[in-house]
A protein has these predicted regions:
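Extended, charge-rich alpha-helical interface modules
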Residues: 2-73
Protein backbone atom coordinates (compact mmCIF):
# COMPACT_ATOMS: atom_id res chain seq x y z
CA UNK A 1 0.00 0.00 0.00
CA UNK A 2 1.40 3.39 -1.03
CA UNK A 3 -0.14 5.56 1.74
CA UNK A 4 2.19 4.43 4.54
CA UNK A 5 5.24 4.85 2.29
CA UNK A 6 4.29 8.47 1.61
CA UNK A 7 3.69 9.16 5.29
CA UNK A 8 7.01 7.50 6.19
CA UNK A 9 8.76 9.68 3.62
CA UNK A 10 7.20 12.76 5.21
CA UNK A 11 8.18 11.47 8.66
CA UNK A 12 11.79 11.06 7.52
CA UNK A 13 11.75 14.60 6.09
CA UNK A 14 10.41 16.15 9.31
CA UNK A 15 12.84 14.13 11.44
CA UNK A 16 15.72 15.51 9.36
CA UNK A 17 14.34 19.05 9.75
CA UNK A 18 14.23 18.59 13.52
CA UNK A 19 17.79 17.23 13.59
CA UNK A 20 19.06 20.16 11.52
CA UNK A 21 17.33 22.71 13.76
CA UNK A 22 18.64 20.98 16.91
CA UNK A 23 22.18 20.96 15.50
CA UNK A 24 21.90 24.66 14.67
CA UNK A 25 20.58 25.40 18.15
CA UNK A 26 23.45 23.48 19.75
CA UNK A 27 25.97 25.36 17.62
CA UNK A 28 24.51 28.70 18.72
CA UNK A 29 24.44 27.69 22.38
CA UNK A 30 27.82 25.95 22.57
CA UNK A 31 29.86 28.31 20.41
CA UNK A 32 28.11 31.66 19.91
CA UNK A 33 31.42 33.37 19.09
CA UNK A 34 31.85 31.10 16.07
CA UNK A 35 28.57 32.34 14.59
CA UNK A 36 29.76 35.78 13.59
CA UNK A 37 27.34 36.24 10.69
CA UNK A 38 24.33 36.37 13.01
CA UNK A 39 24.33 39.49 15.18
CA UNK A 40 20.89 38.65 16.63
CA UNK A 41 21.75 35.39 18.39
CA UNK A 42 18.64 35.47 20.58
CA UNK A 43 16.48 35.81 17.49
CA UNK A 44 18.31 32.92 15.81
CA UNK A 45 17.92 30.74 18.91
CA UNK A 46 14.19 31.54 19.02
CA UNK A 47 13.90 30.68 15.33
CA UNK A 48 15.68 27.34 15.84
CA UNK A 49 13.49 26.47 18.82
CA UNK A 50 10.40 27.21 16.73
CA UNK A 51 11.74 25.00 13.94
CA UNK A 52 12.32 22.12 16.39
CA UNK A 53 8.83 22.56 17.81
CA UNK A 54 7.19 22.70 14.37
CA UNK A 55 9.03 19.59 13.21
CA UNK A 56 8.06 17.69 16.37
CA UNK A 57 4.40 18.58 15.83
CA UNK A 58 4.58 17.31 12.25
CA UNK A 59 6.36 14.14 13.38
CA UNK A 60 3.56 13.46 15.88
CA UNK A 61 0.99 13.96 13.12
CA UNK A 62 2.78 11.49 10.83
CA UNK A 63 3.00 8.95 13.65
CA UNK A 64 -0.70 9.39 14.37
CA UNK A 65 -1.57 8.86 10.71
CA UNK A 66 0.55 5.71 10.61
CA UNK A 67 -1.21 4.39 13.74
CA UNK A 68 -4.62 5.11 12.23
CA UNK A 69 -3.57 3.27 9.09
CA UNK A 70 -2.48 0.22 11.15
CA UNK A 71 -5.85 0.12 12.94
CA UNK A 72 -7.71 0.07 9.62
CA UNK A 73 -6.04 -3.21 8.65
Amino acid sequence: MMGPKLINAALTHFTAERERAEATLLAYCNNPVGVGGHPDLVGEVIKSISEVSDAEERIRMCQSLLEQNKKKK
